[in-house]
Amino acid sequence: MLGMQYDPFEYEMPWRPNYELRCALVWFATALIYLFWAAIGFFSAGVMLWFAAIMLAFGFYYLRPGLLLWEKQGRLVGAPPSFITLKAFRELLGDPAHRNDLWIGEGFEWSVSEIQALTQLNARDEKELITMAVADRKRRIALDLIKRKDTWLHPKQALKHYALKVAEAKREMGSPWIHGVGEDNVNQWMPLNHADGHTLIFGTTGAGKTRFFDLLISQAILRGEPVIIIDPKGDEGMEKNAREACKALNREDAFVYFHIGHPEKSVHLNPLSNWASADEIASRISALLPQDSGSAPFTGFSWLAVNTIAQALILCNISPTLTGLKQYLEGNMEQLVVKTMTAWFKQQMGQEKADRVMRQVLGHIPATSSKGVAALIDFYRVKMTDKQSDVINSLLSMYEHDSTHFSKMITSLMPIIHQVATSHLKDLLSPSEEAQSDKVLFRDMQELIANRCVVYIGLDTMSNASVGAAVGSLILADLTAVAGSGYKFGKSQVPSPGNAVEDFRESRLPKFDHSTHVNVFVDEANEVANNPFIQLLNKGRGANFRLFV
């Protein structure tokens, strides 16, 4: 957009020697000479004063444009990082005119003038620009030191300080003159609803992406909206700023800390707790498998195995966990078969009759022994031909599968399962039924969002990249399931269930108000990107999810 004062016939070249300031200095020097001559009586004092006044007039005429040009060229040197206190930040955001805006910092709008200035800069040699910028920075550092009283009291320390500042100026990264082509830096606001289409933030290492994240996170917290922060590298500053923002609102209890590198301080979180259909669980796990050429049969078989176990657990009204899946993938299938068939008998016959049938079928044979399992299978296939379950049929097919072949087909799956279901991650990601009853220690993503919590998730990928990436992918998939429920059900209740699996599904669905905007911040997104994450980016807007990547 062209400015109101833009003149297409006016040409300005600001990146040149400052002739105006030089002229002003010459005119002022000449005026001093005339004043000196007037003082010593070299010529007529009146004439000398008139000449001095003329020289001063010319000097002041050139001084203003010279100073403006000096200031403009000085901006090419860049500026030190600016900071704002949380109190001042809240006052800034409290402006009624920007109640529905997002503050993105200070800067200027690009117009024809700025584009022309940048074009002229690009036409110059970059080394020349760097030399000019460093030289100008030296002059400014020297002027600042001269103004300070302690410079004259401690000249040696002042010289050391000068050398240190000059060295820092030479080490600055990037191209600071890009930000210097604008005239004035003012507060820049973006309509908040523009963020509904998600926001991509990119820049080189150390360019300030994470600190910009801090600004956006603090604003989301101050708006009282739920915030999910996924931080693969575990930035302490990001966690601290989020915690301080909660403290400023007197909502310290709303801050939830999850970090796989600090299990002693972390809450427990089950990344398989939210789903609308049980096969989503298998899809989350199989998404972690390597997608190499020729791996499709192994991936498909692994998906089928996980899905079968998850369906069986759900039929038993047991919440699927990573350790539960690991337990039955490694063996103990007899135990799962007995649990599943017992649950099915109770659903079809009632508690009392099912217990009586179990006693008749098993007698004194242990239920989990090979003979006991065989007896239950025979009864199921012979006596319950009209009341069979697809879940049990799939489970029996897997149970009777050749164990050697089964182990080979899930070779790529087991390392992934071991990564996220052993050691300290076992308790963090697979809480027991007892732990899940502890609402302080165990938290659920749907409950966290419903309570508008601020959830910091540190993945510690610097220590173990593969484990951190796997955990991050699972958590993002869990978030995608929460968002997906907003598409399917919105604020309404789930349709009446038709069987026990549907009933259990209803109990796992989020029951928060989907009109609430959920802010998801994913730093270093390449570490955790997967198919559910792409789906969340593609369709999350309809569920009021805002992603900042």
Region annotations inferred by a language model:
Residues 180-183, 192-195, 202-205, 211-545:
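P-loop NTPase motor domains
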Residues 1-229, 233-252, 315, 346, ...:
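Accessory regions of macromolecular translocation/handling assemblies
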